[in-house]
């Protein structure tokens, strides 16, 4: 009887033990969502690791494009990061503004991400709204999903 109780207890405790999460070995990712790819209504970004903590990204959205350099807090593509991003909103006659600034990106261990930061205006186009003409800083934000490749 003691052996049976001991076996049951060992089995119960062994089920509860969990190993450490294995970090992603993937070195690239694609993200898509609202205000991704340079701040377009919808867009996508392609990101690739340059080294242990650094990565680069480039993206395109609905009449927008952007690029950036990122520093990941952990040396994995699926970790949160801080970035220096360039957003170019509008193309040709629809060009509104170009922004450059720091952004914090939160990445959940799987799929979900969001960004928030500030962008300094480095260019204005013919379609910039009158209310934004004298505003030197703009809030940069986006929400979406990412998929390590």
Task: Pin down the residues of each PLM region.
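Cleavable N-terminal export/targeting peptides
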Residues: 1-25, 149
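Outer-membrane beta-barrel strand-turn architecture
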Residues: 24, 50-52, 73-77, 106-112, ...
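Transmembrane beta-strand segments that form the barrel wall of outer-membrane beta-barrel proteins
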Residues: 26-38, 42-67, 79-90, 114-122
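Short hydrophobic/aromatic beta-strand or adjacent loop that forms the aromatic wall/cage
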Residues: 64-66, 97-99, 138-142
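Outer-membrane beta-barrel "beta-signal"
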Residues: 69, 105-107, 134-149
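Short, positively charged, low-complexity/disordered linker segments
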Residues: 95-116
């Amino acid at each position: 009887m003691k052996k049976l109780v001991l076996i049951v207890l060992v089995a119960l405790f062994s089920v509860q033990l969990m190993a450490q999460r294995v970090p992603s070995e993937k070195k690239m990712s694609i993200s898509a969502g609202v205000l991704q790819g340079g701040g377009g209504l919808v867009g996508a970004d392609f990101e690739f690791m340059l080294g242990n903590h650094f990565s680069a990204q480039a993206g395109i959205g609905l009449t927008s494009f952007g690029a950036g350099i990122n520093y990941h807090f952990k040396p994995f593509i699926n970790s949160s990061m801080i970035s220096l991003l360039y957003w170019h909103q509008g193309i040709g006659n629809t060009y509104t503004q170009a922004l450059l600034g720091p952004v914090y990106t939160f990445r959940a261990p799987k799929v979900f991400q969001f960004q928030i930061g500030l962008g300094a205006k480095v260019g204005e186009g013919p379609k910039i709204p009158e209310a934004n003409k004298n505003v030197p800083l703009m809030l940069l934000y986006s929400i979406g999903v990412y998929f390590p490749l």
